[in-house]
UniProtKB/Swiss-Prot annotation:
Keywords: Ribonucleoprotein, Ribosomal protein, RNA-binding, rRNA-binding. InterPro entries: Ribosomal_bS20, Ribosomal_bS20_sf. Binds directly to 16S ribosomal RNA. One of its GO terms (cellular component) is small ribosomal subunit. It comes from Rippkaea orientalis (strain PCC 8801 / RF-1) (Cyanothece sp. (strain PCC 8801)). One of its GO terms (molecular function) is small ribosomal subunit rRNA binding. The gene is rpsT. It holds the Pfam family Ribosomal_S20p. Belongs to the bacterial ribosomal protein bS20 family. NCBIfam families: S20. This is Small ribosomal subunit protein bS20.
Amino acid sequence: MANSKSALKRIAVAERNRLHNKAYKSAVRTLMKKYFEAVQAYGNNPTPDNLSVVEQCMSAAYSKIDKAVKRHVLHRNNGARKKARLAKALKQVATAS
């Protein structure tokens, strides 16, 4: 256990940041899952409506990833890798149909 006042404060700050980061990462994962589901639906039925849903999901996911990188929740390479996975999924479906 911490002995000094400043160490106790650091423990409190670390816990606060951990919970904040956990919420951000959870939101990123949720938006990515929604995007992959939208891409799969677009692959099964490629209509302009489904494409617009995919684009909205992509925009939301990209935005949340970029904000997580900006706030140092994710490393920039990790954010870039996640965005590349999203783009790759759509590209594979687009070339298949």
